[in-house]
Every structure is written in C-alpha cells, then in structure tokens.
Curated annotation (Swiss-Prot):
SUPFAM superfamilies: Quinoprotein alcohol dehydrogenase-like. This is DNA damage-binding protein 1. The lineage of its organism: Eukaryota, Viridiplantae, Streptophyta, Embryophyta, Tracheophyta. Pathway: Protein modification; protein ubiquitination. InterPro entries: Beta-prop_RSE1/DDB1/CPSF1_1st, Cleavage/polyA-sp_fac_asu_C, Quinoprotein_ADH-like_sf, RSE1/DDB1/CFT1/CPSF1, WD40/YVTN_repeat-like_dom_sf. One of its GO terms (cellular component) is nucleus. It comes from Solanum lycopersicum (Tomato).
Length: 1090
C-alpha cells in the first residue's frame, strides 16, 4: 500500500442522532427531517408512509437540528449547528427541489473550554433569538431582526458551569431560558433567566427550583396554554412553572428521548435506556395543571430521538439499533403492547468490531459486524452486489437465447421457457413437482434456432427464426399464420412485442409487421445504408402493447438510431464513436424517465435520456460493465422494472433518486437472462451460465446487502475460524431484573452458516472479554481461539488482573485447553511468528506455546515483553515489526529481535493522539484513527541520517473523516477481478460508531495526482449544503491544531462527479482538459472499489 490514499464510504451512516417534524417543503406538507451525524434526510409523510425526498451530506458533524418559523414565513426553516462551531439556516426551494442557504456563520470563540455535556442549540418559540451553549460559562445569542434575518451574535456570562440542559420557555413576554445544572456538591437545580437583547445580558427569571432528583437530566418546555416546564429525572418527573409544582414517582429509568404528541403539549412520549416507550400526560382544568400520569405503551429500539408524525404514527430514531416507524394503537395486542412496528430502517451503528470473511467461498469478502448495543445488539452480514437464490437448475450446453411465454394473454404467470440453441429450439415448463421438464409447442419450428419469441395479443405467441415469423395459438398451440423472408434473404436480427414485430434481413433491410387475430401483416419496409446489429421496440409509452418508435443499432457507421413506427422514418441518429458495434439496445423507463440503453461488444454501456415525444437523445453517459459483449433484458422485482445486463460481469441497472445505479450480480459469467415468473417461484429469473440453466429469485435490488442476526445482547469482539466453520464472540448480556449483577459476559461460538449459538463459555463475575483471535502455534497443527479478558472491579480505575484463555473447537463445542493469568486487561492479541503477542495494560508481552513440565498438555509461557506505553490498546504486526496504538501517545513501532529474544522500540510518533484503531499499510507506512475523528498515516524513516531521525515516525498523511473508527481490517467488499484497473489496488476496510463501513484504497502516485486535481475542481463546482466548506471539513482538527488534509482524497466527493448534470461535467472537463467520457470512466472504475 502507499502514502496516497483514497477514502470512500461503502455504507453511509445509519445512526440517527436527531429528528424533527414540520412543514419544510411546503405549507401543507408534513416532513420528517432526520440527521445521521454527517447527513440529513428529508422525508414527506404521505398516506402510503414516509417518502424520501432528499438525502445530502453535511460538511460537519451535526450538533443541533431544529425547525423554526420566523414571522411572515408560510413554511419552516431548518437550523443546523455543527460540532466544529459552524451554523446554517436552510430553506426549501420548491422550483429546484433542493435546499438553499438562507444564512450561515461561525460561532466559535478563540478562548473558552468546550462543554463536557455536548453542545446545546435552541430557538426561542417566538423567533426572537437563537441560543447556543458551546463553551462552559457562556451562552451565545444570535438575535433575529423583525424581518426574520439573523443579526450579529454576542455572548452572555452564565455562572452555572455544569449545565445539563437549557430550553426556552413558552409564553414569556421577554425571551426566557430555563437552565438545569449541577452544583459543586453534585446537587441538581433549575433556574430561569430573561434574555435582555438591549443590554446583552441576563435578568433574573420568574422562578427557580432547587434540589431536584439526582438523575434529573432533561427539560421539556410546555407550550401554551399551560406553559412551564417538565423536569425528567431517573426516579421522578416534575412539572414546574411560576405558579405550580407537581411531581410523580416513576420506575427507575434514564430517559433518552422525548416527542410531543399534541400541539397544546398535554401529552409526551418518553423513550428510556431499555427501549421502553411511555406516555406522559399532564392533567389540567382549563389552564391549571392538576397532576401528571404516566403509562407504559410498549417496547421499541432504544430511542435517541422520537418524532410524533400524525394519526398515531411515530418515528423512533436509534443510535443503538434499527430505527423504526411505529403506530400507537388504542387497544393492546396479546402481549399487552400498544406499539406496532410498521417499518424498520437498518442501522449498523455502533460497529464495535468486525471481520472480513468469504463465507460463500467465491472470492468475495463479506463483512460481519458486531453492531448495535445493549438489548439491540446484533451481528450484521454485509456484502456487495446482488445474490441469486437458486431454486432449480438443469445442465444445458450452448444456449443462444431464452424467452418466457404465457399460456394466455391475461394469465398472471409464465408457463413456457423457450431455450434456443444453434440448430434447435427446446421448450421447458414447470411440472407438478416444480421441476423443469421438456414440453412442446406444436406450432413452433423446433428444428432451427429461434431468434426471438414473445407473447402476442389474442392469446397468441410469436416465434421468429431465420426464415420466417410464426404466429401460434397459445391455447391450442397450433400454427395460425406464417410470414416468410423474401427469397435469397434470411432474418438475422429480430424483436417483437405483443402487437408488433421488427426484423432485419442482410444488407440493411428493415421489415415491420403488425400482429392481428390470426394474421401477420407486413406494414412497412425500409432499406438502410448499413447492416443492422440490434433492434428494440419495447413499449414504454402510454400503450403497454404498442411502441411508436424503434431503436436500431448499426454496423459500419457505429450508430444508434430512432425510427418512427409504423412508417419507419428516421427521427434521431447518434454516432457512438470508436470501432465497437452496438450489440444490444433497449428502451426502458425508470422512475418515470425514459432511457435508451445501448450495450457495445467490448463491455461498455451507453445510456441516454430518451424523449418519447421527439425521439431526441440527450444526457449521454458511458460506463464499463465488463469486457465481453452485453445483452440487455428488463425484469420486474417488487413491482419495479430493472434491467439485467448479462456478460462476463453480470450487472443489474436500476434507478434511485432519478439516477441510474449499477450493482454487480454475485455470479460468474452469464450469457443470457430472461424473467420467468412461475407460480411456484414468483418473480424468478432464468439464467444461462457456462453449461447450465438456473432458475432463481433475486435479492433486493441495492448495492449492499445486509442480513441481520439479532442477538438480544451486545457482541463486542468477533473472530472467524475457517477450519471449523465457526465464529467466536465476546459478548455481554444486560439483565434488568438482577440488580446485583446487571451484566453477564460470555464467549460464544456460532456456526458460520446458520449463525446459531452452538457453544457458550461464561466468564467470571466482573470479567469482560477484551480481545479475541483465531491462531495456531509453532509445532502444533491445531487451530485455537484465544480470548483476552479483564476483571473490571468497581473500585479500580484500571484493571489489575485479567486472563488469556485458549480454546479448541471439538464437535462444535468450546474446550478450554489452557489459561494464563495476567496483571491487567488483555486489550489486544496477535499471532506472532508462531507465538502469541498480548497487549496488557501498559506493556506488550510475548508468550510461547510450550509443553508443561509434566510433559502432558501445553501452556502459555512468558518469553519477553516491552514497557513504555500509557495503555497499549491496539496492536498490529507484520514480520518482526509491532505497531502499537496507545491510549494517548499516538503510534509507536517496536521490533522483536530473535538473537536477544527481546522486544525494543524502534521509533514513535511524538504527537499526542488518543488512538481508536491502527493498521499496517505496508512495511513503512502505518495508519491510525484517533478520538477527534481524524485519520493519519506515519512513515518509518529507515533512511534517516541520525538516530534521532530514525527514531521518529514522520506524519505523512492527515485527514478529517468525521467518524469515530473502531477497527481497520485488510480486505475488500468486492470480487477482485484481475482484468479491471482497480483489481490490483490494495484496500483496508473500516467500521465506525455511526454505522459507516468505509474503504481506504492506496493509489499509484500518478492516479492520486489526477484525482487530486479532479477533487480541487469539484470543490469549485459542488458547493457544500449550508455554505459549509469541504476544505475546512476535511482538515485534520484537534485541540492543538488544524491543518489541511494531505495525501488523502475524499472518494465521496470525487464519486459525486457521476451525479452531476452533463453541462457541469463539461465545465470540469474543460478545467482539467480531459474529455468527459474519460473522467466518467476513471471515476466509474473507483466506484468498483466498494
């Protein structure tokens, strides 16, 4: 790998951090707006559910997301503040269907200590000001003028230092905040302040409340007519206002999120740390509060946000499990729950650990993650591409084409599968045992190759061969009519739909027929300048059985043309360029947009937007799908039409957000595909591969596939052992009932195909699993699982005791073979030259696997070690080199010296980085992630002139990822095909707290320089949402310094080139002096890295 790295997201963040509801896209439209840390999604509430409208990246980690409506506005605006102290106000532009920036700014202060409890951003309900609590002891005010525009910000001193929450109160003549804080004796109180915009200061507020519940952590301001505030504690809930005080006890719980149900604020939904959803009701007589009631509704994912939508629909956003759309029912179900889950939205966060495995054994990596937390813990199997689930298969050599036919026009299912060979045609059908067997359609000519078949109107079937077109009854299967090719000519290309047939005979002759009841009419004939290579009349206009236009691909001038039907007049001619002929053309419609797809003989695909009214072709784009000729066919899955491109690299073409996407199919070469929708296997596909025909159903159409294995407990570490086909986990189960020991820790063994627990080893009380490894030792052919643990005692700051456990898998059971006590937590385990390397608190320890003195079994024996770390948390090895990521002392490089049998330090990075993960890219370059969401690389300086130079790891790359990385692993999510340009590029995968799976690819220097130039040009063309700067966002940032990113490129920005309109692509092409086609090809190739 190299110094020049490309960072790209394979799976976007899914951890929902904020959500809000309001009329953002229109005065009458109700929107749910969701923040996923560095992205926002805008949804529209429709009778059918939530409809996505926009999903955009934000160049910052979102700290505040609030809707508000200044005076004189008919719809809401969106206020966003980021963790790096930028803010913006966004407005919906209905014309362009995108967000525009109303205001933006920077609210950082030169001095000031960032708050420990996170940033707070709030908006006065009467839109007089925005309040921000970003630094201890300061409250920042951004006032509005009377036109709703923002004025200059100022700070007010806030004497409460340990602030837990701040909200604006409703119904106050002057803007008033309520502050929940903790004093230096750990008691909690609430205070109110009026904000005087004139004096730029606080005035004592109308009331205060001292000595609340010790767990009070959340304020909920109550709107008029009641006003006042709810204070949510761990054991009590209090309603407080200038005139009233009401309190009720609750079962001990930590409330994580709330959502207001009614506009008058009399009912609230509360979500706690166990995922229990309660309804809190304020009882009142007119405007006088009489009491509080709380009722358990049921269980959801552990909520980080709750947004009440409408008509009892509620969005539950989660950071520890899947987010949900739920409905609250008036009557409980059989389990007593009022909560009904309607939709689940996958969330991989937090990814605490993962491993890369090839479970299908087909050369493609899958990532198995430890995802979620507490009761929502799960394993997720993530793989790229679309799988085909095989239902039936038969051995057949030399298939030249396939079509499915029905036995009647209105039959919902297909009956026949016509399979064409070089000198015959066979007809297959499903028998009663759901097996494929051969049958006959008497009216078909089975002694010759079929060029095309189709269902036709009036319960007919049409078969085109080289010398005729046959029209056959689908009920009696008899021949009804036949059209013969003129003497001396034979048909070489043909296509048909339910009412039309278009065919080409040699010499550029084009013949158009129409199908009647028992008749074939030759309607029109035309002579073209060159031979015809491919045809399509797939009806995508108003009439599902008739097309007004035909697409024709030509030899010699290498063009694609659009002709009118029935008169065969030329409407459009598009030169394709190059020397490779079009092999397959297809007109299709995705999300209401008509396209012409044109596949070439060398694996390239062109797509154009096709105007149905004028036949015009625009917005030309070219991608490389494979290296062999491609054939295109449409198919349906879940009531949506997609296109299957069969070739040496089969691909499904689909559309999302009106953009064409390409997802590889997990099959080796496919020569032909056709939909085969039979009753036994609905929505199936027939697929011809080398020597066999397979019938199978297709996965959901998306780029990444995620399978969930709910565990009901939190998996913290995972390892795979290929020899035993198992996974081993370190996991923790949280029990609510048993208060003495709320956590139980286990080592669990899972089958790698079924993912069922097959064996469990419970750890001791207070013992945590910290690390896990599958390895073998010198002079021992067995494969073992080694587990590193720590005893976490309540009274100790740092564990002083742990164990290393060595297990073998026998008959699907974990057998403990050896254990070794340690003087601290075993944070990391690595296989090292046939020995075991452990990181234990501040030291690195090497163990050998040796026979015991009694000569019987084996044990771990200490060989040597190395002190000198604060806490050695992350370790990677390569050869004799050991790279250590320290709690706070960045990265150091150690070496094991065989002769002396000792480990010594060779070099270190002298910066203070608090590490979260490390990986070795190559002999000299090491990658690190740290707790300010940055990535960096360091280089070993073996050529240094002095010892001092050689002892320093030089920082060579820096980048702000904006994500907390928990683990790096070498590997790839995609099939590595040696013939592709990216086949040789080494990659590292990472997993983050927000559920991001990312890829870091090391590039050759010339490619890096080219892409760096492209990135610079893209920054000028693509502006960040809210005016946020991409350059600032990607700059390495911690408490001590901010420096521009270097030797890292943002793949997400680079790949967004493919979403640009043609004229913006041309703008970039001009600036780079590189043709658009070339830019698209180079960026397309990169998308194949993930």
């Amino acid at each position: 790998m190299s110094v020049w790295n490309y960072v790209v997201t394979a799976h976007k963040p899914t951890n929902v951090t904020h959500s809000c509801v309001g009329n953002f896209t229109g005065p009458q439209e109700l929107n749910l707006i969701i923040a996923k840390c560095t992205r926002i999604e805008i949804h529209l509430l429709t009778p059918q559910g939530l409809q996505p409208m926009l999903d955009v990246p934000i160049y910052g980690r979102i700290a505040t997301l609030e809707l508000f409506r200044p005076h004189g506005e008919t719809q809401d605006l969106l206020f966003i503040a980021t963790e790096r102290y930028k803010f913006c106000v966004l407005q919906w532009d209905t014309e362009a269907s995108e967000v525009i920036t109303r205001a933006m700014g920077d609210v950082s202060d030169r001095i000031g200590r960032p708050t420990d409890n996170g940033q707070i951003g709030i908006i006065d309900p009467d839109c007089r000001l925005i309040g921000l609590h970003l630094y201890d002891g300061l409250f920042k005010v951004i006032p509005f003028d009377n036109k709703g525009q923002l004025k200059e910000a100022f700070n007010i001193r806030l004497e409460e230092l340990q602030v837990l929450d701040i909200k604006f109160l409703y119904g106050c003549p002057k803007p008033t905040i309520v502050v929940l804080y903790q004093d230096n004796k750990d008691a909690r109180h609430v205070k109110t302040y009026e904000v005087s915009l004139k004096d730029k200061d606080f005035i004592e507020g109308p009331w205060a409340q001292n000595n609340l519940d010790n767990g009070a952590s959340l304020l909920i301001p109550v709107p008029p007519p009641l006003c006042g505030v709810l204070i949510i504690g761990e054991e009590t809930i209090v309603y407080c206002s200038a005139s009233a005080f009401k309190a009720i006890p609750i079962r001990p719980s930590i409330t994580r999120a709330y959502g207001r149900v009614d506009a008058d604020g009399s009912r609230y939904l509360l979500g706690d740390h166990n995922g229990l959803l309660h309804l809190l009701v304020i009882t009142h007589e007119k405007e006088k509060v009489t009491g509080l009631k709380i009722e358990l509704l049921g269980e959801t994912s552990i909520a980080s946000t709750i947004s009440y939508l409408d008509n009892a629909f509620v969005f539950i956003g989660s950071s520890y499990g899947d987010s949900q759309l739920v409905k609250l029912n008036l009557q409980p179900d059989t389990k007593g729950s009022y909560v009904e889950v309607l939709e689940r939205y996958v969330n991989l966060g937090p990814i605490v650990d993962f491993c890369v495995v090839d479970l299908e054994r087909q050369g493609q990596g899958q990532v198995v993650t430890c995802s979620g937390a507490y009761k929502d813990g799960s394993l997720r199997i993530v793989r790229n591409g679309i799988g085909i689930n095989e239902q039936a298969s038969v051995e057949l050599q030399g298939i030249k084409g396939m079509w499915s036919l029905r036995s009647a026009t209105d039959d919902p299912y297909d009956t026949f599968l016509v399979v064409s060979f070089i000198s015959e045609t066979r007809v297959l059908a499903m028998n009663l045992e759901d097996e494929l067997e051969e049958t006959e359609i008497e009216g078909f000519n089975s002694q010759v190759q079929t060029l095309f078949c189709h269902d036709a109107v009036y319960n007919q079937l049409v078969q085109v061969t080289s010398n005729s077109v046959r029209l056959v009854s689908s009920t009696s299967r008899d021949l009804k009519n036949e059209w013969f090719a003129p003497v001396g000519y034979s048909v070489n290309v043909a296509t048909a739909n339910a009412t039309q047939v278009l065919l080409a005979t040699g010499g550029g002759h084009l013949v158009y027929l129409e199908i009647g009841d028992g008749v074939l009419n030759e309607v029109k004939y035309a002579k073209l300048d060159y031979d015809i290579s491919c045809l399509d009349i797939n009806p995508i206009g108003e009439n599902p059985n008739y097309s007004n236009i035909a697409a024709v691909g030509m030899w010699t001038d290498i063009s694609v043309r659009i002709y009118s039907l029935p008169d065969l007049n030329l409407i459009t001619k598009e030169q394709l360029g190059g020397e490779i002929i079009p092999r397959s053309v297809l007109m299709c419609s995705f999300e209401g947009i008509s396209y012409l797809l044109c596949a070439l003989g060398d694996g390239h695909l062109l797509n154009f937007v096709l105007s149905m009214s004028t036949g015009e072709l625009t917005d030309r784009k070219k991608v490389s799908l494979g290296t062999q000729p491609i054939t295109l066919r449409t198919f349906s899955s879940k009531d949506t039409t997609h296109v299957f491109a069969a070739s040496d690299r089969p691909t499904v073409i689909y559309s999302s957000n009106k953009k064409l996407l390409y997802s590889n199919v997990n099959l080796k070469e496919v020569s032909h595909m056709c939909p085969f929708n039979v009753a036994a296997f609905p929505d199936s596909l027939a697929i011809a591969k080398e020597g066999e025909l397979t019938i199978g159903t297709i996965d959901e159409i998306q780029k990444l596939h995620i399978r969930s294995i709910p565990l009901g407990e939190h998996a913290r570490r995972i390892s795979h052992q290929e020899q035993t086909r198992t996974f081993a986990l370190c996991s923790v189960k949280y029990t609510q009932s048993n208060a003495d020991d709320p956590e139980m820790h286990f080592v669990r063994l899972l089958d790698d195909q079924t993912f069922e627990f097959i064996s469990t080893y419970p750890l001791d009380q207070f013992e945590y699993g910290c690390s896990i490894l599958s390895c073998s030792f010198s002079d021992d052919s067995n494969v073992y699982y080694c587990i590193g643990t720590a005893y976490v005692m309540p009274e100790e700051n740092e564990p002083t005791k742990g164990r290393i456990l060595v297990f073998i898998v026998e008959d699907g059971k974990l057998q403990l073979i050896a254990e070794k006590e340690t003087k601290g937590a075993v944070y990391s385990l690595n296989a090292f030259n046939g020995k075991l390397l452990a990181a234990i608190n501040q030291k690195i320890q090497l163990y050998k696997w040796a026979s015991r003195e009694d000569g019987g079994s084996r044990e771990l024996q200490t060989e040597c070690g190395h002190h000198g770390h604060i806490l050695a948390l992350y370790v990677q090895t390569r050869g004799d080199f050991i790279v250590v990521g320290d709690l706070m002392k960045s990265i150091s490089l150690l070496i094991f010296k065989h002769e002396e049998g000792a480990i010594e330090e060779r070099a270190r990075d002298y910066n203070a980085n608090w590490m979260s993960a490390v990986e070795i890219l190559d002999d000299d370059i090491y990658l690190g992630a740290e707790n300010n969401f940055n990535l960096f690389t360091v280089r070993k300086n073996s050529e240094g002139a002095t010892d001092e130079e050689r002892s320093r790891l030089e920082v060579v790359g820096e980048y702000h990822l904006g994500e907390f990385v928990n683990r790096f692993r070498h590997g790839s999510l995609v099939m590595r095909l040696p013939d592709s340009d990216v086949g040789q590029i080494p990659t590292v995968i990472f997993g983050t707290v927000n559920g991001v799976i990312g890829v870091i690819a090391s590039l050759p220097h010339d490619q890096y320089l080219f892409l760096e130039k492209l990135q610079t040009n893209l920054r000028k063309v693509i502006k960040g949402v809210g005016g946020l700067s991409h350059e600032q966002w990607r700059s390495f940032y911690n408490e001590k310094k901010t420096v521009d990113a270097k030797n890292f490129l943002d793949g997400d920005l680079i790949e967004s080139f493919l979403d640009l309109s043609r004229n913006r692509m041309e703008e970039i092409s001009k600036a780079m002096s590189v043709p658009v086609e070339e830019l698209m090809k180079r960026v397309e190739e990169l998308t194949r890295l993930h």
